[in-house]
């Protein structure tokens, strides 16, 4: 009986130890407040540099994609966001997620 209790105690102790040492891979949930105005210009520019610069150029001058230097004078923020999300011409859809598309669109809409 004593050996069974010892085995149970060791098993329990190991379980507790493993649980305490386990990694916490839980991802933080992003809370979307629904406000696109909270995005700063630097966030929009940073996302552009990460995802768009290859086709539209460092200074929005256009490379294989069109020039975007005055895109805000041609399209409003919602149209720009729609193009980013759904693609157009040679630009495929889904290059960025919806939240990133909104941030980039807000930033680009100010380019007039």
UniProtKB/Swiss-Prot annotation:
Subcellular location, record wording: Cell membrane
Lipid-bearing positions (S-diacylglycerol cysteine): 21
**Swiss-Prot/TrEMBL keywords:** Cell membrane, Electron transport, Heme, Iron, Lipoprotein, Membrane, Metal-binding, Palmitate, Signal, Transport
On induction, the UniProt comment says:
Induced during exponential growth. Repressed by glucose.
Q: List the InterPro entries.
A: Cyt_c-like_dom, Cyt_c-like_dom_sf, Cyt_c_BACSU-c550-type, Cytochro_C551, Cytochrome_c550/c551-like
Q: Which NCBIfam families match?
A: cytochro_C551
The entry's protein name is Cytochrome c-551
Q: Which GO terms describe its cellular component?
A: plasma membrane
Signal peptide range: 1-20
Residues engaged in binding heme c: 52, 55-56, 91
Stored Gene3D superfamilies: Cytochrome c-like domain
UniProt biased composition (Basic and acidic residues): 25-35
- Other comments? Present in very low amounts in the cell.
Give the GO molecular function terms.
Answer: electron transfer activity; heme binding; iron ion binding
Under PROSITE patterns, the record lists:
CYTC (PS51007), PROKAR_LIPOPROTEIN (PS51257)
Q: Where is the lipid attached (N-palmitoyl cysteine)?
A: 21
Instruction: Tell me the membrane topology, using the record's own terms.
Output: Lipid-anchor
Q: Which Pfam families match?
A: Cytochrome_CBB3
What domain of life does the UniProt record list for this protein's source? Bacteria
Q: Which species is this UniProt entry from?
A: Bacillus subtilis (strain 168)
């Amino acid at each position: 009986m004593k050996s069974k209790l010892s085995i149970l105690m060791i098993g329990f102790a190991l379980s507790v130890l493993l649980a305490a040492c386990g990694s916490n891979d839980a991802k933080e949930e992003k809370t979307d407040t629904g406000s696109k105005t909270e995005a700063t210009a630097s966030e929009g520019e940073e996302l552009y540099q990460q995802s768009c610069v290859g086709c539209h150029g460092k200074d929005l001058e256009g490379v294989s994609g069109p020039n975007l230097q005055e895109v805000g004078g041609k399209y409003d923020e919602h149209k720009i966001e729609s193009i980013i999300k759904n693609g157009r011409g040679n630009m495929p859809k889904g290059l960025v997620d919806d939240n990133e598309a909104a941030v980039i669109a807000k930033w680009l809409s100010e380019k007039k």
